[in-house]
Each structure stands twice: as structure tokens, then as C-alpha cells.
């Protein structure tokens, strides 16, 4: 019974990765849209996009870490 609860909890915690994937998609969609509107700002927009990517991916990695902690503890 405890093993089943660990697997269910780990799966539910891993659902946070869905949000990270959506966030990364939104960040790079905004980058493509911004560069298509104003190509001269490509360098500055790319810097902001990488920062947004890192922040949204960090939340996904935290969710993955919690999932692994629930699974292997």
C-alpha cells in the first residue's frame, strides 16, 4: 500500500513538468514574435528569452526533484 502511494505521489508531483514545458513554449513563441516584429532587438530579446527559459525550467526541475524525493525516500 505504501509503495502504491509513493508511485501515485511521484506521478502527481511530476505533473509540474507540464507547466514548465508550456512555459518554455510560451517564452520562445514570444521571442519569435518579437523578433519578427523588430529584428534589430534580436540580441536583447534573446537574452530575456534565455532568462525566461531558465526560470521556467527551474520550476520544472524543482517538480522533478520533489517527484524523485517522493519516489526514492
Swiss-Prot record:
Segments spanning the bilayer are: 12-32, 50-70
InterPro entries, alphabetically?
ATP_synth_F0_csu, ATP_synth_F0_csu_DDCD_BS, ATP_synth_F0_csu_sf, ATPase_proteolipid_c-like_dom, F/V-ATP_Csub_sf
Annotated positions for site Reversibly protonated during proton transport:
57
All disulfide bonds of the chain are none
Where is this chain's protein located in or outside the cell?
Mitochondrion inner membrane
State if Membrane is listed as a keyword.
yes
Pfam families with a match to the protein in the record = ATP-synt_C (PF00137)
State the Gene Ontology terms under molecular function: lipid binding; proton transmembrane transporter activity
Q: How does it sit in the membrane?
A: Multi-pass membrane protein
Provide the alphabetized UniProt keywords. Answer: CF(0), Hydrogen ion transport, Ion transport, Lipid-binding, Membrane, Mitochondrion, Mitochondrion inner membrane, Transmembrane, Transmembrane helix, Transport
An example of a Gene Ontology BP annotation on this entry?
Answer: proton motive force-driven ATP synthesis
Q: What does this protein do?
A: Mitochondrial membrane ATP synthase (F(1)F(0) ATP synthase or Complex V) produces ATP from ADP in the presence of a proton gradient across the membrane which is generated by electron transport complexes of the respiratory chain. F-type ATPases consist of two structural domains, F(1) - containing the extramembraneous catalytic core and F(0) - containing the membrane proton channel, linked together by a central stalk and a peripheral stalk. During catalysis, ATP synthesis in the catalytic domain of F(1) is coupled via a rotary mechanism of the central stalk subunits to proton translocation.
Similarity annotation: Belongs to the ATPase C chain family.
Please state what the protein is called: ATP synthase subunit 9, mitochondrial
The gene from which this protein is expressed is: ATP9
